[in-house]
Amino acid sequence: LIFYSFFLPDVLRKLIVLSCVFLILSGILLAYPELFPWAEESSATSLLHIWAGFFFLVIFPMYSWDHIRGHADRLKKFSLLTASGIVQFFSGLGLIVSGIPLLLYGTDVLDFPREIHLGLTFVLAGSLVLHKFSRK
């Protein structure tokens, strides 16, 4: 992975976390426009969410695979840290899989992927917090 070799793993981890936080916040703004009237019908928020999603689509699987390989010894014993990491991995993949049809067809057309995407957003947020505060 040539791209990965240019970054220190810590820098890439921070980029992943920042993109997750941005995507979670912008997704909530887009999902609940009645709570944020100033963001209603904001094409800037939508475009930034889409572009950050493309970044996440490329970076997340690459970083996840390297992170899993780097911590393979820890994965052999079950802990809260391992469980939250597994939940992060699968919710991130689910967000990618459910986000692609939403991008192609729109959120007004596809109710089921929209609900899955929204639910996985909260799952990812919770697992990020849990992973951060779990004992290493």
Predicted regions and their residues:
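Membrane-embedded alpha-helical bundles that constitute the cytochrome b-like, heme-associated redox core
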Residues: 1-136
